[in-house]
Amino acid sequence: MSSPQLYYRLSARTHATPLRDSVARDVVHLLNCAMRGASMGMPSDAPVASSVLNFGNPCMATLGRSRVDPQHIANSIRQTLAAFEPRLLATRTLVVARQDTDSPGSRALYFDVHGVLRHQGHHIAIRLVLDYLGGFFEWIQERP
């Protein structure tokens, strides 16, 4: 049996960091996948709408829209996480468009995702950047 001192030397951060990194990578992958159903015109309450066959983020290109709405995209991100990321509690997930998003000439939008991991109860914070001309998300990793 191991010594109890070893238990106290292990920090919660060492366990939470790899899990947070894994969730962050998977969130970026999820958001960079496009829902197939968005282009097929299926009803949103159809069972396939939230199945793995329709995995991903809804299409952000909408006909007739010339302005990018960060709040609309933040809501879309939250709904995608609620549907397809089971490690985050959907009721405790918040996606916020950062204020520096609307700088003139910028082609990037910044989002902060705050959530709670379902089984461990740890808070998780992920910073994302969306290059909306290229149409892809990236994870902004914090420097140690």
Each PLM stretch: what is its role?
Residues M1-R65, L117-P144:
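Immediate N-terminus of the mature polypeptide
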Residues P18, S22, V68, H72, ...:
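Charged, alpha-helix-enriched surfaces in structured cytosolic catalytic cores
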Residues N54-D100:
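Acidic, low-complexity glycine/serine/threonine-rich segments
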Residues V96-F111:
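Beta-rich nucleic-acid/ligand-interaction surfaces
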Residues F111-L117:
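A short beta-strand signature
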